[in-house]
UniProtKB/Swiss-Prot annotation:
Keywords: Decarboxylase, Lyase, Magnesium, Metal-binding, Nucleotide-binding, Thiamine pyrophosphate. Thiamine diphosphate binds at residues 372, 396-398, 421-423, 448-449, 478. This is Oxalyl-CoA decarboxylase. GO terms for molecular function: ADP binding; identical protein binding; magnesium ion binding; oxalyl-CoA decarboxylase activity; thiamine pyrophosphate binding. Induction: By the acid response regulator EvgA. It comes from Escherichia coli (strain K12). Activated by ADP. One of its GO terms (biological process) is oxalate catabolic process. It catalyses: oxalyl-CoA + H(+) = formyl-CoA + CO2. ADP binds at residues 158, 220, 280, 302, 322. Pathway: Metabolic intermediate degradation; oxalate degradation; CO(2) and formate from oxalate: step 2/2. Optimum pH is between 5.5 and 7.
Amino acid sequence: MSDQLQMTDGMHIIVEALKQNNIDTIYGVVGIPVTDMARHAQAEGIRYIGFRHEQSAGYAAAASGFLTQKPGICLTVSAPGFLNGLTALANATVNGFPMIMISGSSDRAIVDLQQGDYEELDQMNAAKPYAKAAFRVNQPQDLGIALARAIRVSVSGRPGGVYLDLPANVLAATMEKDEALTTIVKVENPSPALLPCPKSVTSAISLLAKAERPLIILGKGAAYSQADEQLREFIESAQIPFLPMSMAKGILEDTHPLSAAAARSFALANADVVMLVGARLNWLLAHGKKGWAADTQFIQLDIEPQEIDSNRPIAVPVVGDIASSMQGMLAELKQNTFTTPLVWRDILNIHKQQNAQKMHEKLSTDTQPLNYFNALSAVRDVLRENQDIYLVNEGANTLDNARNIIDMYKPRRRLDCGTWGVMGIGMGYAIGASVTSGSPVVAIEGDSAFGFSGMEIETICRYNLPVTIVIFNNGGIYRGDGVDLSGAGAPSPTDLLHHARYDKLMDAFRGVGYNVTTTDELRHALTTGIQSRKPTIINVVIDPAAGTESGHITKLNPKQVAGN
């Protein structure tokens, strides 16, 4: 009599496929039809981090992908849960972060005939415009190859978000266990090196060597590449001033003598040759137009050929992965050495010193209530002594001022709103950074921005994560002194509840809360929060009149011809 065959099902197969591909963490929100999948993943040793909203779970997965070069995994239920996570998936794609969103879905036979199934939605086709790729699995024997494809697509070339649709009937479908194991694919070399054209590398070095005022701009693609040592060696060998975009801060420490960040406007307006390293010439750099010299020549190092010539002609495109491209640039530099003219470095230093003095005056001015400058000065003092922390930052004025004031000393320690300038990333990124690294995280939040994902403080407390949330509370979106134009006593469109005590939220979840009104109180609370490794909220009372409309990008608001 033969032994009885051992059977398995789709949800066990997908979990085994995740394990065999070294996926160790899932971020998500459970419900029909994925609850048992999450339970089984946890039973198999995969960490499951449960959120209060799928969007934050997706942001956590994306942050994990950025920090590790492995796809972060987000798990959602069907239809509404899928749509909640879709914003995070799109944001990952736009920013170039590897992420896979796995969602349960309804019965295809009913959905395709629009017969009104539970949470009916054609999720795969809804995801396609916003993801790097989207796949649906219709039979359990395809789960292994589907996950393998999702992993490879998410990390190869320019990284991005991939959607994987798992209908409930596929999760429940059965297979003989030994046969199922043969269908699982372990991905080998998912992101192979893409070497640049040697002629392009030679041309790039030749153009830089002739430049009188060269500048290197480091983008988050450079940070993602983890080519930190090659970038440092190249910049220091050629003595080329560099300008980091916000999430590239710390590749070289912001206090490095070649950093041109404090003379950003002058550097952009006067550089004659600019080398973009994993940075896109998009709205964050005024598309290379306003504020730039008309005759600036560009070298662009990017993994995506379609990015070249997107806004300004690129004199020398160097297409390849950043690590390989920088290795080639270093080798060529050693064969054809040059040093940036001292006069260019000196004039940048003069402008840096002038701007630093102006900033010092703002930072050292004592006010009551606090403003962004003196409050961020206190934060900067504490973080200077805690350089291992991860910094998450979102808001308008809170983001823009913190980016300029707070120095970063190590790569990939700053996570912010990125290419889309999206609000709501704060708690998800903070949780993702904490879970991935095990290090303390400080989230510097505008009060409006915090509101997008504030309920995730329960998640932070439930997992006892070392996250300190600093909320700059001026009682409004941008500012808290808006005017009611209706005359009906209604709040202004930009006003929030004045005198809100966000620190009190921690009473509900057994975290720690501080309400601070002075820089000394802020320094003490932040130092204590970091050192204690306890979930902490610091409510920083800011002048309602502090800040400007839309922060540093007021000019993006359409101009009115008439009206209020």
